From Swiss-Prot:
GO terms for cellular component: plasma membrane
Homology family: Belongs to the staphylococcal tandem lipoprotein family.
Signal peptide: 1-22
Membrane topology classification: Lipid-anchor
Protein name (Swiss-Prot/TrEMBL): Uncharacterized lipoprotein SAB0394
Subcellular location: Cell membrane
Keyword Membrane attributed: yes
InterPro entries: Csa (IPR007595), Csa_sf (IPR038641)
Keyword Transcription listed: no
Keywords in alphabetical order: Cell membrane, Lipoprotein, Membrane, Palmitate, Signal
Lipid attachment in record (N-palmitoyl cysteine): 23
Transmembrane segments: none
Length: 263
């Protein structure tokens, strides 16, 4: 389901994009973009938002302002929604996901969320509800703890030791990323950048260490952002590392940081 959704959504974005900015056909693909080009603006915008990585202490989000659109009420300080999820589907086997989402409310300075394990049916690409496990969690003192008793010690330990990508990801070398594929839709506004990474990339090594990623294939990095390109605050920032993407075989990691109105 996630595989199909992200393929469809990405294609829609590409079709609606007013600017599809790739490598200049008439020049070397490694040539640096002009300062005023849309490509340069997109990369500069991502550089600003990715500069906040890592945020080791999630409680720092309580004091962090984000991009506010017309949906926010005047007295609402907003809520940060952070998510990290690994998706694995060995060849010929069922797709399984495991990850966590946390709502960090700046008004109440409280954070609650869920740790979720899912299986995706191969027949209809839908979540198998009989195989879905959801555990409520909260954050106290920068630590994630279950709000209910969990008999499975392995799951309990995984929750307590869980780290979001935003806590350890690092993009200090982002300016050196070359040969990106860019798209931009000013109406939304949404924009994206895609890069081919190498296995010696810091973030790739971190993901391999934490999630026992079996393939030796180097991943592609897809960045998706939302909000004003000229605004340095974060509205929506989605990160996807795709190691394997084939019919019946997938390995990818999703992470997102989004600033939303409080409920």
């Amino acid at each position: 389901m996630r595989y199909l959704k992200r393929v469809v959504l990405y294609r829609i974005v590409m079709v609606l994009s007013v600017f599809i900015i790739g490598c200049d056909k008439s020049s070397d693909t490694s040539e640096k973009p002009k300062e005023d080009s849309k490509e340069a603006q997109i990369k500069k915008s991502f550089a600003k938002t990715l500069d906040m990585y890592p945020i080791e202490n999630l409680e720092d989000f309580y004091d962090k302002e984000g991009y506010r659109d017309g949906e926010f009420k005047k007295d609402d300080k907003g809520t940060w929604l952070i998510r990290s999820e690994i998706v694995k589907q060995p060849k010929g086997k069922v797709m399984k996901t495991r990850g966590m989402q946390l709502y960090i409310n700046r008004n109440t300075k409280t954070a609650k969320g869920f740790f979720v394990l899912k299986e995706i049916s191969e027949n209809n690409n839908r979540v198998n509800k009989d195989k879905e496990e959801k555990y409520e969690v909260k954050m106290v003192g920068n630590k994630i703890i279950p709000t209910e008793q969990i008999n499975d010690e392995k799951i309990k330990k995984e929750i307590e030791n869980f780290k979001f990508f935003v806590q350890y990801g690092n993009f200090k070398n982002f300016e050196k990323y070359n040969n990106g594929e860019f798209s931009y839709n000013p109406e939304a506004p949404i924009y994206s950048a895609k890069y081919q990474l190498h296995n010696d990339d810091y973030n790739v090594r971190q993901l391999r260490k934490r999630y026992e990623i079996s393939t030796k294939e180097a991943p592609k990095l897809l960045l998706k952002g939302g909000g004003d390109l000229k605004d340095s605050s974060v509205g929506q920032n989605d990160i996807e590392f795709t190691f394997v993407e084939r019919k019946g075989e997938n390995i990818y990691f999703n992470d997102s940081v989004e600033f939303i109105p409080s409920k």
